[in-house]
Amino acid sequence: MEVVIKISTTEAKKYLLIDTSVLPDVFEEVIQVKELLRSAKVKDITEAVKKVGISRSTYYKYKDYVFNVSDGLKSQKVTISILIEHRRGTLSEVLDKLAQRCCNILTINQDIPINNTANVNITFDISGISGDVKNIVEELKKIKNVLKVEIVAME
Protein backbone atom coordinates (compact mmCIF):
# COMPACT_ATOMS: atom_id res chain seq x y z
CA MET A 1 0.00 0.00 0.00
CA GLU A 2 1.25 3.49 -0.79
CA VAL A 3 0.33 6.49 1.33
CA VAL A 4 0.74 10.20 0.67
CA ILE A 5 1.88 12.11 3.71
CA LYS A 6 1.21 15.83 3.75
CA ILE A 7 4.06 17.75 5.32
CA SER A 8 3.14 21.36 6.06
CA THR A 9 5.69 24.12 5.86
CA THR A 10 5.20 27.79 6.61
CA GLU A 11 5.26 28.76 2.92
CA ALA A 12 3.41 26.00 1.07
CA LYS A 13 2.18 22.46 1.44
CA LYS A 14 4.60 19.75 0.41
CA TYR A 15 3.62 16.17 -0.44
CA LEU A 16 5.73 13.03 -0.52
CA LEU A 17 4.93 9.62 -1.94
CA ILE A 18 6.29 7.04 0.48
CA ASP A 19 6.19 3.24 0.40
CA THR A 20 4.34 2.09 3.51
CA SER A 21 6.94 -0.56 4.29
CA VAL A 22 9.14 2.18 5.79
CA LEU A 23 6.36 3.90 7.75
CA PRO A 24 4.91 3.14 11.17
CA ASP A 25 1.71 1.07 10.98
CA VAL A 26 -0.33 3.94 12.41
CA PHE A 27 -0.48 5.69 9.03
CA GLU A 28 -2.06 2.68 7.33
CA GLU A 29 -4.43 2.29 10.26
CA VAL A 30 -5.61 5.89 9.86
CA ILE A 31 -6.26 5.14 6.18
CA GLN A 32 -8.24 2.03 7.20
CA VAL A 33 -10.39 4.13 9.55
CA LYS A 34 -11.04 6.66 6.78
CA GLU A 35 -12.02 3.84 4.40
CA LEU A 36 -14.44 2.35 6.94
CA LEU A 37 -16.07 5.74 7.43
CA ARG A 38 -16.23 6.51 3.71
CA SER A 39 -17.77 3.14 2.87
CA ALA A 40 -20.30 3.42 5.75
CA LYS A 41 -19.25 0.03 7.13
CA VAL A 42 -19.25 1.62 10.56
CA LYS A 43 -21.62 4.16 12.05
CA ASP A 44 -19.08 6.57 13.57
CA ILE A 45 -15.43 7.30 14.31
CA THR A 46 -15.52 5.55 17.67
CA GLU A 47 -16.61 2.28 16.09
CA ALA A 48 -14.05 2.62 13.27
CA VAL A 49 -11.05 3.24 15.54
CA LYS A 50 -12.07 0.34 17.81
CA LYS A 51 -12.33 -1.97 14.80
CA VAL A 52 -8.88 -0.94 13.51
CA GLY A 53 -7.26 -0.80 16.94
CA ILE A 54 -6.08 2.80 17.28
CA SER A 55 -7.13 5.58 19.63
CA ARG A 56 -9.41 8.44 18.62
CA SER A 57 -6.64 10.92 19.42
CA THR A 58 -4.25 9.11 17.06
CA TYR A 59 -6.87 9.20 14.31
CA TYR A 60 -7.52 12.93 14.83
CA LYS A 61 -3.79 13.66 14.98
CA TYR A 62 -3.14 12.25 11.48
CA LYS A 63 -6.47 12.23 9.63
CA ASP A 64 -5.85 15.54 7.84
CA TYR A 65 -2.28 14.66 6.91
CA VAL A 66 -2.39 11.11 5.57
CA PHE A 67 -4.13 10.16 2.33
CA ASN A 68 -4.34 7.12 0.15
CA VAL A 69 -2.69 7.67 -3.23
CA SER A 70 -6.06 7.21 -4.93
CA ASP A 71 -7.53 10.05 -2.82
CA GLY A 72 -5.33 12.68 -4.35
CA LEU A 73 -3.84 11.35 -7.56
CA LYS A 74 -6.42 9.20 -9.29
CA SER A 75 -8.21 11.94 -11.16
CA GLN A 76 -6.52 14.82 -12.87
CA LYS A 77 -8.76 17.46 -14.35
CA VAL A 78 -8.16 20.13 -16.95
CA THR A 79 -10.51 22.93 -17.95
CA ILE A 80 -9.96 24.52 -21.33
CA SER A 81 -11.64 27.50 -22.93
CA ILE A 82 -12.15 27.33 -26.68
CA LEU A 83 -13.35 30.11 -28.96
CA ILE A 84 -14.99 28.60 -32.04
CA GLU A 85 -16.69 29.93 -35.12
CA HIS A 86 -20.39 29.14 -35.26
CA ARG A 87 -20.11 26.41 -37.90
CA ARG A 88 -21.79 23.03 -37.96
CA GLY A 89 -19.64 20.18 -36.63
CA THR A 90 -16.86 22.25 -35.03
CA LEU A 91 -17.68 21.29 -31.44
CA SER A 92 -18.18 17.70 -32.55
CA GLU A 93 -14.67 17.68 -34.05
CA VAL A 94 -13.24 19.04 -30.81
CA LEU A 95 -14.99 16.33 -28.79
CA ASP A 96 -13.87 13.65 -31.25
CA LYS A 97 -10.25 14.79 -30.89
CA LEU A 98 -10.50 14.66 -27.10
CA ALA A 99 -12.02 11.17 -27.29
CA GLN A 100 -9.21 10.00 -29.60
CA ARG A 101 -6.71 11.05 -26.93
CA CYS A 102 -8.64 9.12 -24.22
CA CYS A 103 -9.89 12.22 -22.39
CA ASN A 104 -12.97 11.63 -20.25
CA ILE A 105 -15.31 14.61 -20.64
CA LEU A 106 -16.75 15.78 -17.30
CA THR A 107 -18.54 19.02 -18.27
CA ILE A 108 -19.23 21.09 -21.36
CA ASN A 109 -20.55 24.65 -21.20
CA GLN A 110 -21.18 26.51 -24.46
CA ASP A 111 -22.21 30.15 -24.61
CA ILE A 112 -24.71 31.40 -27.18
CA PRO A 113 -22.90 32.39 -30.38
CA ILE A 114 -22.46 36.15 -30.72
CA ASN A 115 -21.08 37.60 -33.95
CA ASN A 116 -20.67 34.02 -35.24
CA THR A 117 -18.33 32.96 -32.42
CA ALA A 118 -19.02 31.00 -29.26
CA ASN A 119 -16.99 30.30 -26.17
CA VAL A 120 -16.92 26.68 -24.98
CA ASN A 121 -15.51 25.55 -21.64
CA ILE A 122 -14.73 21.85 -21.36
CA THR A 123 -13.51 20.08 -18.24
CA PHE A 124 -12.09 16.61 -18.71
CA ASP A 125 -10.22 13.93 -16.81
CA ILE A 126 -6.68 13.40 -18.10
CA SER A 127 -5.66 10.49 -15.87
CA GLY A 128 -5.85 8.08 -18.81
CA ILE A 129 -4.79 10.27 -21.73
CA SER A 130 -2.35 9.38 -24.44
CA GLY A 131 0.25 12.13 -24.80
CA ASP A 132 0.31 15.30 -22.75
CA VAL A 133 -2.08 18.21 -22.35
CA LYS A 134 0.05 20.70 -24.27
CA ASN A 135 0.01 18.43 -27.33
CA ILE A 136 -3.76 18.04 -27.07
CA VAL A 137 -4.18 21.83 -26.93
CA GLU A 138 -1.99 22.22 -30.01
CA GLU A 139 -4.06 19.59 -31.87
CA LEU A 140 -7.28 21.40 -30.95
CA LYS A 141 -5.88 24.68 -32.29
CA LYS A 142 -5.40 23.02 -35.70
CA ILE A 143 -9.09 22.15 -36.07
CA LYS A 144 -10.87 24.21 -38.70
CA ASN A 145 -13.05 26.98 -37.17
CA VAL A 146 -11.26 26.79 -33.79
CA LEU A 147 -10.01 30.32 -33.16
CA LYS A 148 -8.42 30.05 -29.72
CA VAL A 149 -7.67 27.38 -27.10
CA GLU A 150 -6.48 28.14 -23.56
CA ILE A 151 -5.94 26.05 -20.45
CA VAL A 152 -8.03 27.72 -17.74
CA ALA A 153 -7.30 25.36 -14.86
CA MET A 154 -5.41 22.17 -14.17
CA GLU A 155 -5.78 19.99 -11.08
Swiss-Prot record:
Its domain of life reads: Bacteria
What is the protein's given name? Answer: UPF0735 ACT domain-containing protein CA_C1234
Q: From what organism does this protein derive?
A: Clostridium acetobutylicum (strain ATCC 824 / DSM 792 / JCM 1419 / IAM 19013 / LMG 5710 / NBRC 13948 / NRRL B-527 / VKM B-1787 / 2291 / W)
Matches recorded under SUPFAM superfamilies: ACT-like (SSF55021)
NCBIfam families listed in its UniProt record: PRK04435.1 (NF003361)
Output the Pfam families linked to this UniProt entry. ACT_4
Q: Which protein family is it in?
A: Belongs to the UPF0735 family.
Domain ACT, which positions?
79-154
Could you list the residue ranges forming a coiled coil in this record?
none
